[in-house]
């Protein structure tokens, strides 16, 4: 059907949604302010040791996760789209300057919508293959991203 919205195959997509008791401007700010992102983006006891974000289409992103044992895991990517207070889209398919990554894994789409004075937060992870999706799910997508969403909600409520 012409004009119908296209959605990825369910076998390649993971979705998490939360109703956050905070205005979407605050939830969006928690996603786009590096100092705030560092406070919630890793499931505790993991932390974020470094954040670089150029929040424009084509801008580079680097988020470094740190394990409780001190091992660091850099996550480079490129920002694809930013709509203030509505959407953030990024991918690991590219690194800085549109250089293809060695192993593209996913594109992430975060949306923020008003819902009864709160924010409907939806995080979609779109994977290149069903195997990548399964790997991400087996790594603890629902638990890890769920814990991060809870940490995001707590931070957005207090800023």
What is the role of each PLM region?
Residues 1-47:
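Hydrophobic ligand-binding cavity/cleft-lining segments
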Residues 27, 37, 61, 79, ...:
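Hydrophobic pocket/interface hotspot
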């Amino acid at each position: 059907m012409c004009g119908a919205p296209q959605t990825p195959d369910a076998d390649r997509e993971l979705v998490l949604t939360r109703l956050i008791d905070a205005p979407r401007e605050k939830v969006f700010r928690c996603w786009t302010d590096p100092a705030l992102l560092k406070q919630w983006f890793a499931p505790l006891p993991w932390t974020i040791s470094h954040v670089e974000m150029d929040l424009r289409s084509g801008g580079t992103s680097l988020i470094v996760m740190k394990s409780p044992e001190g091992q660091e895991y850099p996550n480079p990517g490129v920002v694809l789209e930013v709509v203030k207070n509505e959407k953030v889209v990024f991918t690991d398919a590219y690194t800085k300057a549109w250089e293809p990554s060695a192993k593209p894994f996913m594109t992430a789409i975060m949306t923020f919508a008003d819902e009864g004075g709160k924010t409907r937060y939806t995080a979609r992870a779109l994977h290149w293959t069903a195997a990548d999706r399964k790997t991400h799910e087996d790594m603890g997508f629902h638990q890890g991203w769920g814990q991060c969403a809870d940490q995001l909600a707590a931070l957005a409520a207090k800023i």
